[in-house]
Amino acid sequence: FLPLEDVEAIELRPDVPRLAIEHLGLDDDPRLYIRIGDAVELLPSAEPADLIFVDLYNDLGPAPGHLAWTFLESCQKKLQPNGWLVINQWATDDGKPLGAALLRGLFHRHYWELPVKEGNVILLVPGDLDQALDIDALTARAQALAPRLGYSLEALIKAIRPAT
């Protein structure tokens, strides 16, 4: 659904790529390069990116190193101009992301949150403070994709909120 030239993935758990290939239809695509290891250690050698997804969990729950100021700041600095950092984060009982105070301080409340049913909050962090989230363009793109996806993303887009 995206015109990708190459994708570099850093996965902590070696079984995840194997399971994705065996059960989720992940193809052996020459554009995909998977590195196994801790992103805290491997991020410095990663290429700059237009889009970085961070899943802040290990087998026991939130990974402390991945919810650290220096790591998240390094992720944001790896972004190309107009890039986006997307963080899958646990939600607390009040619906805010775990580490909300750290996130507000680091990103100056310049990010958006998308609460999801599973109890997580997806954070959409722009590469710099001049970037804005264009909801109209996002909605138009989602509407164009809906027939290919077989479902609508409209409810998710409507749930996007400013940083709490």
PLM regions: where:
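The AdoMet/dcAdoMet-binding core of the Class I SAM-like
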Residues: F1-K77
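Generic structural marker for isolated residues within well-ordered, non-membrane alpha-helices
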Residues: P17, A100, A142
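A generic structural signal for alpha->beta connector loops
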Residues: L4-D6, D29-R31, N82, H108-H110, ...
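C-terminal substrate-binding/active-site "lid" region of AdoMet-derived donor-dependent transferases
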Residues: A63, W69-A132
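Generic structural "secondary-structure junction" signal
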Residues: L26-D28, T92, Y151, P162
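SAM/dcSAM-binding transferase cores
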Residues: W112, K117-T164
